[in-house]
Amino acid sequence: MWSVRMRASKKENNIEKHISGAEGIYDYSQIERVLKQLFKRAFEHSKGKPDKVVITVERINEEIQTVSALPVNTFFTNSPEEAFCLISEKLSSIGISDKALFSAFEVIKKYPMRGATLIDSITGERLERDKTRGIRVSRIHMDKRKRMKLIRQIKNLSTQPQRVIEAITIASKVASYPEVVAELCISDNPDYTIGYIASRDLGYLRITNIKNKGETIGGRAFFVKTPCDIEKLTNYLERKPVLVI
C-alpha cells in the first residue's frame, strides 16, 4: 500500500499560504488515477490557484491500524454566536474548561497554522512543540464501503460530501488516541461555514454557521488530557497509517 499526499500553496507577502490539501492510502494500481485527481483538485480551489504543488507518494511498510468512524450528527445554528454557545455546552459536558475553549478560539483566529494546535483541556496551555507549523494529521484513508454509506447519509445535508468524508476521517483518527478528549475545527475556506467538534463521547457533530461567509480564518484544535507524551501523540497523528472503517 502507498500513502499519497498533496499540498498546494501560494506565496503572499513573502509568506506561504495554504490553498488546499488531500491524501489517502492506495494500491499501486490506483496511484496514477489518484495523482491526476489530486493535481486537478489543487488548481480548482475557491482560495485561488497555487504557485506550488507538492505531491508525495510513499510506500507504507508497517501494519495499517483500523479505527471506527465516528457517528455523524448535524446541528443547525443561526450565527457564530449561537454556534459558540452550542460548542461550549457540548465540550464542557465532557470536561473541557472554558479557559481551554477560549484558548483554542484565540489560537485559531490569531495564529493561523498549517496544522492543528494542541490545547491542555483544563489549563488551556498550548502543548505542540512547533507552534508555527502545528500538528498535521496524515496517512489516513476511509474504507470504500463506509465512505459510500456516509455519503448516502449526508447527501441531503451537504453539497460537498467528499469534504465531510475527509473531515470525518481525520476526526476519527484523532479521537482514537486515548489522551485526546475532543477536536474543534473551523474551515479556512471562505465559502464554507460549517465546522465541527468531535470526540469519542460526542461523535462527529457538524455545526452550521460556525463562522460568517467570506472569512478566511480557520484551523483545528485538539484538546488533550494531561499528562500526555506529546512526542508519542504527534508521531501517531502524523505518521501512523490508519484506515477508518
Swiss-Prot record:
Catalytic activities: heptanedioate + ATP + CoA = 6-carboxyhexanoyl-CoA + AMP + diphosphate
Record bears the keyword Nucleotide-binding: yes
The EC number(s) this enzyme carries: 6.2.1.14
GO terms, biological process: biotin biosynthetic process
Keywords from the named record: ATP-binding, Biotin biosynthesis, Ligase, Magnesium, Nucleotide-binding
Involved pathway(s): Metabolic intermediate metabolism; pimeloyl-CoA biosynthesis; pimeloyl-CoA from pimelate: step 1/1
InterPro entries per the UniProt record, alphabetical: BioW (IPR005499)
Pfam families in alphabetical order: BioW
Co-factor requirement: Mg(2+)
GO molecular function terms attached to this record: 6-carboxyhexanoate-CoA ligase activity; ATP binding; magnesium ion binding
Self-association and partners: Homodimer.
NCBIfam families named in the record: bioW, PRK01322.1
Name listed for the protein in its UniProt record: 6-carboxyhexanoate--CoA ligase
